[in-house]
Amino acid sequence: MRLFNQLKWYFIKEWKRYLGSIILLIIIAFLQLLPPKIIGILIDLIIKEKMSGFEILPWISIILLIAIIVYILRYLWRILLFGASYQLATELRVKFYSYLSKQSEIFFLKNRTGDLIARATNDVDRVVFAAGEGVLTLVDSSVMGISVLIVMITQISWLLTIISLIPMPIMAILIKKYGKKLHDTFRNAQSAFSLLNNQTQEILTSIRMIRAFGLEKNQLKKFNNIVNDTGKKNMEVAEIDARFDPVIYLSVAFSNLLAITAGGWLVWNNTITIGKLTSFIMYLGLMIWPMLALAWMFNIVERGSAAWDRIHSIINQNLYIEDGKKTIINMNGKLNINIDMFFYPKNKKPSLKNIYLSLNPGKTLGICGPTGAGKSTLLKLIQRQFKIHKGEILYNSSSLLELKIDYWRSKIGVVNQTSFLFSDSISNNISLGKPKASQKEIEKAAKLADIHKDIVCLPQGYNTQVGERGVMLSGGQKQRIAIARALLLNTEILILDDALSAVDGKTENNILKNLKKWKDKGYSLIIVAHRLSALIHADEIIVIKEGTIIQRGNHEKLIKEKNWYKSMYDHQKIQTEIENF
């Protein structure tokens, strides 16, 4: 029942739908009380020979009319109630996605994709089912049960009613006991389903790698273990679930036995008539649904409550990155980076230390260094993916902490080494951040990224479908489409995180020439590269090693110093000459 309190915010919001449903249900309950009463009166009249068969027909017609009206009202009631519950599904999923979109990278490091998908789909469905069927069952069984109970006590016999309901307290105690067990067991089952969902997602994503390494049997064994564990936990839920029905049916059977035995004795003593006993048995039949519904409601509500706990545990987490309130009107500002110390969560060793540099509008900053030196970490801090422990990053003399996250990220375009493309057309992938972009704008961005000539050679040109994650394209083509996508946004700062690694030297040179024309308009460019040829024309290059800057200057200055940059540049130059030989 805790779930109804947890969802009261939605019930208040949709109070008109729920109030309308309750009013219709009260009318339905009143109408359903009439047939047993009518039949009881008719039986007594027939026994006393005060009514002929012909005179019964109008009363039968009334009973049929009541049945038709009840059917129509129940139809309207369900439309109102389930319409509200389906709207809840939409709101919960939008709220869930909205929360995820505001989270930083650390959140996704802690939470698996498959688990988040399970919470956004399966768990939401359980909550919605409880908010629909659960509310329906609660209100229906409560109104009907109370109404029937009042009629049985006031119109027939309070003594017979009390005797017939002796099994009910025992049933209520058992249902409550099983309900608590069901809540805990179902939550474990949902966690197992999340793990299964995540494993399925990982297998489907990496199926080509699994085949390439011949890991089919190994992955099948691993997947089979997870499936069996999930099935075992679901079986535990089913075992507890199976205890509800026997309790209900035994209680109902015992109630009927007591009603017939005690009712027969009351008729024998002329306390009630046969017609009233018949009405009582029919009313007791109407009580069966509330009793069955009570157990079923506890079942689905406990499942819904467990699912809500899983959803709420995600959306109730505090945001790791707090949003600022400031925006800057002036365009093309100066970026100042002053990082004294940065640690990744749970790491004792700093990932970055003593990083101090500036980037003026229209300039290019090159970043290089050994693998794992902290280059991508620096870019993540510029994007506000993590908090800086000591130090700050300024834009136009304003700390990034003061700026609204959405505003700041609209100022920067980022292209990563692994480019993600959606299963859509090339045109739609390029215009992802600017859906209303004209074809001319899309082609202009594609030309800057040196991908236009490749696109026009495809059978469907810009309308070519790239497949899931761009599987129909080469690595270099995907990178260039991602660059075009970022260029289309005309952001003040463009960040290329080793985004030229999959293109050949000639294509790289063409892109860099185009980017030089682009940044001359006042835009800033940050290039992270392992291939140092991409950094030759940068205004400043920094070399990061073990989280700190060990060299800085332009290309001409750095190749004169005997250090990491010159050593790596000479090595790559010789390697290129050998490849071209």
Curated annotation (Swiss-Prot):
Gene3D superfamilies: ABC transporter type 1, transmembrane domain, P-loop containing nucleotide triphosphate hydrolases. Residues 18-303 form the ABC transmembrane type-1 domain. Keywords: ATP-binding, Cell membrane, Membrane, Nucleotide-binding, Translocase, Transmembrane, Transmembrane helix, Transport. One of its GO terms (cellular component) is plasma membrane. Pfam families: ABC_membrane, ABC_tran. CDD domains: ABC_6TM_TmrB_like. The chain crosses the membrane at residues 23-43, 53-73, 127-149, 153-175, 247-267, 280-300. Signal peptide: none annotated. GO terms for molecular function: ABC-type oligopeptide transporter activity; ABC-type xenobiotic transporter activity; ATP binding; ATP hydrolysis activity. The keyword Methyltransferase does not apply. It is a multi-pass membrane protein. ATP binds at residues 369-376. Its EC number is 7.6.2.2. It is found in: Cell membrane. SMART domains: AAA (SM00382). SUPFAM superfamilies: ABC transporter transmembrane region, P-loop containing nucleoside triphosphate hydrolases. It catalyses: ATP + H2O + xenobioticSide 1 = ADP + phosphate + xenobioticSide 2. Residues 337-571 form the ABC transporter domain. Belongs to the ABC transporter superfamily. Drug exporter-2 (TC 3.A.1.117) family. This is Multidrug resistance-like ATP-binding protein MdlA. It comes from Buchnera aphidicola subsp. Schizaphis graminum (strain Sg).
